[in-house]
């Protein structure tokens, strides 16, 4: 939304963005504000996770998951609760058919916008699906697609396979929200089946959206960018959810489809690292809008060199990637892991304690510490990360009660 990384804007949790977003909107520096001011018809459809809920932050119009509930209630058809918690990974089939599901409602609204938009203005449509996000409650017809199909097994490393010996600071967030570390192989397979089913429903929904573009002749003048805010650990290394810089959580898709018929390059895979701030720069580049001076994203349509990546989540989990190596650090427990991402892309072999890699570990840790001192000094104390004790076992972490599915959350996330 702002072209800034979390540690640059100060948004390192879900609860810290309201003031930042208001200030950016006042400066007309949010992505939708810049596009609106450039003459675009801007529309948000689906999950936005904004605070305040109805704050548009530059969008001309916005329809949210809470509006799905309002529509259902007007028809006397509010979806029933199925007992799965907000962050639950144990599958629970949706209580509504696909045609009545929220993802279908979101793509229906997006198609409606394309068919009724202002014909003399360019448009920017942000379609944001709520799934796949816990609780894992796919619609039955998509769940059944994967009946009898073997699921990929969870990934474990030499540092994580033994749960008791694993660096517990990295696991604390998973303990707080799920009990995935107790799942049997069959339970993990069912969880992955549900995740695949929800992804497949998104795929079908996007097929309808792209068909609408073609039917209305918009595919010849529309760029499509598909990406996500985070992934899902899905039991890898005994972990769940997000907030971590391991591949399952942080490595998300970024697909760019150019307008058809212009002879632009297609079907290319680029292995150089990209980040979400680049999406901001890319969209503004497509629109011919100059990005604000304090943003650092690159236009992904153009060749660019590999960069050093720094990450901060919750002022607890940190990461630096440079030259094919990734160092991840947890201030909870003061844990450090080092991976060779070229030869070990699944992060199964920790190099941090090996004598041959001590210089690389010290170099990357120094880079991370110096970068944090410049960009997020409140995460440090006396020149070092502000640490906290790690749990010694799963039972040391209290389990959060996050509410039943279809509860109306403060930020209208409607998981």
Predicted features along the sequence, with ranges:
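Formylglycine-dependent sulfatase
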Residues: 1-330, 336, 345-366, 395-415
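A contiguous, mid-protein "functional segment" used to position or interact
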Residues: 355-391
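Conserved histidine-centered catalytic loops in small-molecule metabolism enzymes
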Residues: 339
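Residues forming the ATP-binding cleft of Hanks-type serine/threonine protein kinase domains
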Residues: 342
